[in-house]
């Protein structure tokens, strides 16, 4: 699964890298070293003409859901079954997004009692994009709530040593394909959801402070040398 990530890159870098045409005021951007489910996260959609940057709550709530609690169980969608699950089939065709990040955290199991937090990033330290889906849900008061999920897939050779799942990091040339609303073939879209190139990734152990979403400072990026 993918349950924590970082996004602390400069706002202008995000705008430039993902060719964003419409976005909220720069002053509203807050870098985060410990993005967690149920938070409002940055996401990019394409409206047919422009790439738009906005905020979606992490944890997808299908339109037919009776209440928003289901969102806590839907922070991830499995790429292998995304065309089958009722909650994901519709947004796969019509409500796709990408979620910018500069690293993510995963907990590596050492034994039956011990797990250690690992920070995973690209060797280049470059920004990248998770593949995501979003939905619009109406509260009982009739207010719209926009939510999202991050898609996961089987681990590549690098990630296998850390976890049995990994988030889908889209290849750069696949980002536009994923966002393009003209692409509506479920099979084609599913074919874009591949494990990222293992040779381009690296990881290191970080402090257990990252275990709590309440902790959110640059020191979470520091390496722990206890492996």
From Swiss-Prot:
SUPFAM superfamilies with a match to the protein in the record: BB1717-like
GO BP term, example: proteolysis
Site (Required to stabilize abasic sites): 163
EC identifiers of the protein: 4.-.-.-, 3.4.-.-
Molecular function via GO: lyase activity; peptidase activity; single-stranded DNA binding
A matching Pfam family: SRAP
Modified residues (Thiazolidine linkage to a ring-opened DNA abasic site): 2
Regulation: Formation and reversal of DNA-protein cross-link depends on DNA context. Catalyzes formation of the thiazolidine linkage in presence of abasic sites in single-stranded DNA. Mediates the reversal of the thiazolidine cross-link in presence of double stranded DNA.
Protein family (similarity comment): Belongs to the SOS response-associated peptidase family.
Listed name of the protein: Abasic site processing protein YoaM
Organism: Bacillus subtilis (strain 168)
């Amino acid at each position: 699964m993918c349950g924590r990530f970082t996004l602390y890159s400069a706002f202008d870098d995000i705008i430039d890298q993902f060719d964003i045409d419409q976005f909220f005021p720069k002053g509203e951007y807050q870098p985060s070293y410990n993005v967690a489910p149920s938070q409002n996260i940055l996401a990019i959609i394409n409206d047919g003409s422009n790439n738009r940057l906005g905020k979606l709550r992490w944890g997808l709530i299908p339109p037919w859901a009776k209440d928003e609690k289901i969102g806590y169980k839907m922070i991830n969608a499995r790429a292998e079954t995304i065309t089958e699950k009722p909650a994901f089939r519709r947004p796969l065709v019509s409500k796709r997004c990408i979620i910018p990040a500069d690293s993510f955290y995963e907990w590596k199991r050492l034994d039956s009692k011990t797990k250690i937090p690992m920070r995973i990033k690209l060797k280049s330290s470059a920004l990248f994009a998770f593949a995501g889906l979003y939905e619009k849900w109406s509260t009982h008061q009739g207010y719209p709530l926009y939510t999202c999920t991050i898609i996961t897939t089987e681990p590549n050779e690098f990630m296998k040593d850390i976890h049995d799942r990994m988030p889908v990091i889209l290849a750069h040339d696949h980002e536009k394909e994923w966002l393009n609303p003209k692409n509506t073939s479920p099979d084609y879209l599913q074919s874009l959801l591949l494990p990222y190139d293992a040779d381009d990734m690296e990881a290191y152990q970080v402090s257990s402070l990252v275990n709590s979403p309440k902790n959110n400072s640059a020191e979470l990026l520091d390496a722990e040398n206890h492996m």
